[in-house]
Design a protein with these regions (language model features):
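Catalytic core of pol beta-like nucleotidyltransferases
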Residues: 1-26, 31-37, 44-95
Length: 95
């Protein structure tokens, strides 16, 4: 089941950002393989392209993925939070 959602996530990101302006990765319970209630999607990129992240939220809201996709702008995230995620969480890079 996880791989099916992963394929959908990759497809949605490719459609949303065909120029590959940002880097995308998954973290949190989805990646750890725990029973999850949401999917955490981290985004790193340039400021101009990050301004459209609310549009990306809409893309996932309208998708058939049965979990809420929380989009986290890692360029604007707290330093301690980024440290925790990058040092202690398993990451699954989308691109």
């Amino acid at each position: 089941m996880k791989s099916r959602y992963l394929k959908q996530i990759k497809r949605k990101i490719t459609e949303f950002d065909p120029s590959r302006a940002n880097k995308y990765f998954l973290f949190g319970s989805f990646v750890r393989g725990e029973k999850y209630h949401d999917i955490d999607l981290g985004v790193i990129g340039n400021e101009k392209s990050r301004k459209n992240l609310s549009e990306l939220e809409d893309v996932f809201y309208d998708s058939t993925i049965p979990y809420k996709v929380d989009i986290v702008d890692f360029d604007g995230a707290e330093k301690d939070f980024k440290h925790h995620v990058f040092k202690k969480e398993p990451l699954l890079w989308i691109r």
